Regions:
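Conserved short loop/turn motifs at secondary-structure junctions
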Residues: 29, 153-154
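Outer-membrane beta-barrel "beta-signal"
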Residues: 4, 135-144, 159-170
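Exposed loop/turn and edge beta-strand positions of beta-sandwich/beta-sheet ligand-binding modules
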Residues: 39, 92-94, 131-133, 147, ...
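A short alpha/beta connector and helix-capping loop motif
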Residues: 125-137
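Hydrophobic, well-ordered secondary-structure elements that form the walls
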Residues: 98, 115, 137, 151, ...
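C-terminal outer-membrane beta-barrel translocator/porin domains of Gram-negative envelope proteins
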Residues: 1-106, 110-116, 120-121
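Short active-site-adjacent structural elements
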Residues: 120-123, 146, 157-162
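Low-complexity, intrinsically disordered Gly/Pro/Thr-rich segments
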Residues: 145-153
């Protein structure tokens, strides 16, 4: 069940102003045909701050928690750059992200990110904070559409990763 959805972003592909807020609650149960019984709660919040016509600060906060017999592939994990997504996975995960997006021409841009997150047995018992930094280049696929194709690199204390992306992370 999607509670309190709110979206006043100026664009779905490359937002430069506005907010996105979403709270989702779900229950899987054998009464509804599920093989596993568990609850899941997820919160996503993003805000986009235009510093100028070419500079955007994008902020995001994500939190998720499950309880019950949750399949491993549906457990919360840190959706951050710099390591394999399932490297940090538990019953709860929370992360915050900040990106500086810069358009240096009509079809070319760049991105620099800083992310922090943690996982644990519940949101009140999160463990060590994981940090990552990233950078990327963007190319606007069509002149009339704000959809970007990009290449990102992310680095954390444990690992690094290379990404080919369509659109923005958030």
């Amino acid at each position: 069940m999607n509670l309190f959805p709110s979206d006043d972003r100026d664009d779905n592909y490359y937002p430069s102003s506005g907010r996105f807020f979403d709270v989702w609650l779900g229950r899987n149960d054998s009464r509804w045909g599920s093989d596993a019984e568990y609850n899941r709660a997820t919160l996503n919040y993003s805000q986009y701050l235009p510093v100028s016509s070419n500079h955007i600060i994008a902020l995001s906060l994500n939190a998720s928690e499950v309880d019950g017999d949750t399949p491993f592939f549906l457990k919360p994990s840190l959706n951050m750059r710099g390591f394999v997504t399932t490297k940090y996975q538990d019953e709860a995960a929370a992360s915050t992200h900040i990106e500086w997006r810069y358009k240096f021409s009509t079809r070319w841009g760049s991105m620099v990110s800083y992310e922090a997150g943690s996982v644990g047995s519940s949101l009140s018992k999160l463990k060590n904070i994981i940090l990552s930094v990233g950078a990327g280049i963007r190319w606007k696929i069509q002149k009339d559409n704000n959809l970007n194709l990009g290449v990102d690199v992310g680095v954390s204390k444990d690992d690094s990763a290379f990404y080919i992306v369509i659109g923005e992370k958030f």
